[in-house]
Amino acid sequence: MREMGTGDSASRLILWFCLGFLILGVGFVQCGVTYDRKALLINGQRRILFSGSIHYPRSTPDMWEDLIQKAKDGGIDVIETYVFWNLHEPSPGKYDFEGRNDLVRFVKTIHKAGLYAHLRIGPYVCAEWNFGGFPVWLKYVPGISFRTDNEPFKRAMKGFTERIVELMKSENLFESQGGPIILSQIENEYGRQGQLLGAEGHNYMTWAAKMAIATETGVPWVMCKEDDAPDPVINTCNGFYCDSFAPNKPYKPLIWTEAWSGWFTEFGGPMHHRPVQDLAFGVARFIQKGGSFVNYYMYHGGTNFGRTAGGPFVTTSYDYDAPIDEYGLIRQPKYGHLKELHRAIKMCEKALVSADPVVTSIGNKQQAHVYSAESGDCSAFLANYDTESAARVLFNNVHYNLPPWSISILPDCRNAVFNTAKVGVQTSQMEMLPTDTKNFQWESYLEDLSSLDDSSTFTTHGLLEQINVTRDTSDYLWYMTSVDIGDSESFLHGGELPTLIIQSTGHAVHIFVNGQLSGSAFGTRQNRRFTYQGKINLHSGTNRIALLSVAVGLPNVGGHFESWNTGILGPVALHGLSQGKMDLSWQKWTYQVGLKGEAMNLAFPTNTPSIGWMDASLTVQKPQPLTWHKTYFDAPEGNEPLALDMEGMGKGQIWVNGESIGRYWTAFATGDCSHCSYTGTYKPNKCQTGCGQPTQRWYHVPRAWLKPSQNLLVIFEELGGNPSTVSLVKRSVSGVCAEVSEYHPNIKNWQIESYGKGQTFHRPKVHLKCSPGQAIASIKFASFGTPLGTCGSYQQGECHAATSYAILERKCVGKARCAVTISNSNFGKDPCPNVLKRLTVEAVCAPETSVSTWRP
């Protein structure tokens, strides 16, 4: 074991200082947060900490307490959040900290739960958030250049950072004041951007660090993905794996600020899933190397309400395949397996923070990391890096079986209490179920294209960049011009129609010719620039061409935000006329920001004039583009999370009682959904689902936004969907599965005082649990033996205990939860001696009121 060095001495001095004051009867002493090369020290004590990202504006305030408590119950110590500048300062000097923007309330809720907080001020956040969290008005500060050594930008950034720090200080929220905030972050993932900028980037990064330190928060600052972070700022890692990361100084701890629990979804793409076996493997690899702080990005992803989604093309759902899903429900097995991982690692904490690992080879692709402390504490991590084969290894004269791509954790260097690949918790099957809400009665309002040239428009020569015109007050900008066609044009006499070609910098465009939709075109997140090319039907005389350019979230990654373009910058040209090509780019164009319905505030309950609304049955017969639909509904009974099923619609936006649910788009997902394995390096395209289906079909409707009755639902449809297909559904657990082997690791089999001695073997159990208000209605599958398949498609194998169904029905049906011990005696006899068996179960969950309590 290596000597701990000066960092260890410093931590002991801090600890003795604190204890000395307590012994002298001085009372409570706040010793603050410091660090050494092993870990963060809180009040002088080194800590292994697990953190979870929960972004306050991506859920509603009434959800915060439950989300944070679920995180705590899952073994989380710290809640991490970005701070979103564009929410808090929507216009220069005017601040908003109300509702979902109530940062103080969120941090106090963390404190109330007894957890710590990590405040990532940025103020650049990325986060798949509109404009990376920057307010768009910042783009128009004279002389500004983003994220570089630029005085206007630094002045604005300093002002906002200091405003947030002072707000936290005024509420005593830093740990140095007795609050929960133990870490703060300045900038975000700047390393690559700084390299591109050279000296200016380095100067800016150094300035940002000094500016942050000068705020005197009393807690450490971090910079993620910034190898040159100057002392005392800690540089940290983001990624799917961080076991190869090392801080830039030997006296700084290994901190993983973003352990990606999944990945975000983009319109037109599939959903991404990261197997929990691989996520647990990545975390265990980081800890076995000496890591002491892991933050799951995300632990609860939530929803991109309103127009907050960035990308562009990032979906309204920001579920992220996180342990707590978009709706605030626990995602199993990810939540439970990580909870067991946290518990196992915390058993090793004394050894982990007191020693350095001794690494030895125990096979061709297997290693042991052993932590032996002077106190006698010993913990070991046995790793199998082979992606194909399990390994049987010898460690401390004991054999251990390691599945492929897995790590076993031995808190006492003897008993394996956890293996990253052996999932013993249940899998919960989630479904969207009908509610008792009656069929919606719709009214519709058509955008009047003939009234676009009113006082809200302006005319100029040439094509203008979209955000410079809209200032991001709307997704929509009209580009309108006229084309005169002579009687002699050949296409008027049976010839080929002319072709309109439009080059756009993003993100979508709808083409109207003389008031009729002629075509649409869309970019993608990878290629936001696109070209539209289509035949158009013109008549003799003056023809009106109206192009509705649509933004689908502003980009959130990169530098020089001031230079980014959106909208139609051309060229725009007609081909196939008698004169050949007619370039329309530099003629007069008339512009209108937003839609008429937006100007009329049609989405708000107090602004829904009856003039212009018609019975939707008239529009359903022939769906029209650019149509507003409204209806009223009563809140469904119960407390299950709610969503709108938008499968029959096209693209647009949704509001409930004036609150924006967000953008919807039922674009079909393309990708490869054919294969998924937990083994091997994870990438977002590895485990995908939803190919050939709408990228996002369901849209979260927070219950906090509903009244008991007469809730106003407004939909703006760009393409012409059918509102009669829209329905309100509830998210609930429909069934649970579990599969546990005879010798599954059991934490009960570990007691530190029995190290090296024989002990009673505690047999593993299958645990099944439905959601609150539910009970197990039936057993769909049960087999103790060698069953085959996966959850939802199990089959009996060659070995099967005939009593399996009867045992599970007797112990579980009619109950909200049950546990069944995996033993031969429990099932009458050994169905296949000398064969490793497992108990596999699939159960159906239903409301308690509908489940009979009778059991055979």
From Swiss-Prot:
Quote the EC number: 3.2.1.23
Instruction: List the CDD domains hit by this protein, alphabetically.
Output: Gal_Rha_Lectin_BGal
GO-annotated biological processes: carbohydrate metabolic process
List where this protein forms a coiled coil: none
Which InterPro entries did the record assign? BetaGal_gal-bd, Galactose-bd-like_sf, GHD, Gly_Hdrlase_35_cat, Glyco_hydro_35_CS, Glycoside_Hdrlase_35, Glycoside_hydrolase_SF, Lectin_gal-bd_dom
Positions bearing carbohydrate:
468
Q: Which cysteines are joined by disulfide bonds?
A: none
Tissue specificity comment = Ubiquitous.
What is the protein name stated in its UniProt record?
Beta-galactosidase 3
